[in-house]
Structures are given as C-alpha cells and as structure tokens.
Amino acid sequence: MPKIKMIVGLGNIGKEYENTRHNVGEWFIAKIAKDNNENFSLNSKLNCNIAKVNINYNNIILVFPTTFMNNSGLAVSKVANFYKIEPEEILVVHDELDIDSGEIRLKKGGGHGGHNGLRSIHQHLGTNDYLRLRIGIGHPGHKSKVSNYVLSNPSVAQKNDIDNAIDNGICVLDDIINYKLEPAMQRLHTK
C-alpha cells in the first residue's frame, strides 16, 4: 500500500495572487507548514518552494510551484524525480469550481476538468494516477466569468468557508497519507 510522500499546493506565485481563490491549494500547505513550525525555502532547480514536515512519523515534502499555474507540472515532476516519488505517492490540493465553498472532496485519478494546473501535472507526470484534495470555491455562474473569478479574492464569508474546508482536510490528513481513503472520504463527504 502506498503512502503519500509529497503534498502539492497549487496556485500562482506573487503577492497579487496569494489571496485569490486559485491559491487555496497553497493556503492548505501553508497551514500545514505553519502548524508544524516549518518554513518554505526556494529551490530554484526544482522550480518550487519546499518545506519538509513530519506528520505522525511520516516525512512529507510540501511543494508550492514557483511556475505559474499553467506550468505546475514542471515543478511536480522535477520534485518527484529528484526524491524518487511515484505518482500515487502525491497529493495535489487545488481549487474546484464545481464544489460549493466550504466543501472539500478527495479523489483518486480522473480528468483535469479544465483545471490548467492539473492538465500540466497530467502532461508532465504522464499519468493522472495521483490523489487530489479538491477545495470548493463555488462557480460564478457562467464560464465567461471563470478567469476573473478564480483570480479574485473571496468575500470574507467565503474565505471563512474555505478556511473551514482546509481545517477539515487537515483533520483527515493522517488517513490520506496512509491511504485510508474510505474513512477520509466518509468524513469529508458527509455533512
């Protein structure tokens, strides 16, 4: 049975993006690092910021690509190759338009659903056989509004909902790391 060794938080690099909906994956790994009193450091060769944490005796590499979202797969594949991590040992945390704010879902494999960060990871890894933690940000209503929506900041109420979803995800992280996916899904997907 595999174990998660790398958690990737998707988002765009730069101050102007750090509080946008598209960066909720980065918010997730930043909270893990903070909870473990660890800081990220830039690894320019691997195109990412990295922090190493120990979660219940499991050594985990937290990765925030320093590429833009559309090229996240470059950093993910470089880190995976460098540390000899298999795709099924990777958890990718990202924003999800098709899930309401405050909801969080765990998924193994599947398509990219139009998410450019996932599309890039699929291309660079050559597979979609990794875990995803999908943090709901809601949908703006029409596809023409999606780009502006994901690149803007959530309202205070929506930010609180997203923060609660992040906390819920962190509460089941030990199960996810140890591939106890059914109990994790049950806790996350049950209201």
UniProtKB/Swiss-Prot annotation:
The record marks 12 as: Discriminates between blocked and unblocked aminoacyl-tRNA. The active site is at 22 (proton acceptor). It is found in: Cytoplasm. One of its GO terms (molecular function) is tRNA binding. The record marks 95 as: Stabilizes the basic form of H active site to accept a proton. GO terms for cellular component: cytoplasm. Its main location: cytoplasm. The keyword Hydrolase applies. TRNA binds at residues 17, 68, 70, 116. It catalyses: an N-acyl-L-alpha-aminoacyl-tRNA + H2O = an N-acyl-L-amino acid + a tRNA + H(+). PROSITE patterns: PEPT_TRNA_HYDROL_2 (PS01196). It comes from the Bacteria. It holds the Pfam family Pept_tRNA_hydro. One of its GO terms (biological process) is protein quality control for misfolded or incompletely synthesized proteins. InterPro entries: Pept_tRNA_hydro, Pept_tRNA_hydro_CS, Pept_tRNA_hydro_sf. Keywords: Cytoplasm, Hydrolase, RNA-binding, tRNA-binding. Its EC number is 3.1.1.29. Belongs to the PTH family. Monomer. Hydrolyzes ribosome-free peptidyl-tRNAs (with 1 or more amino acids incorporated), which drop off the ribosome during protein synthesis, or as a result of ribosome stalling. Catalyzes the release of premature peptidyl moieties from peptidyl-tRNA molecules trapped in stalled 50S ribosomal subunits, and thus maintains levels of free tRNAs and 50S ribosomes. This is Peptidyl-tRNA hydrolase. It comes from Francisella philomiragia subsp. philomiragia (strain ATCC 25017 / CCUG 19701 / FSC 153 / O#319-036). The gene is pth.
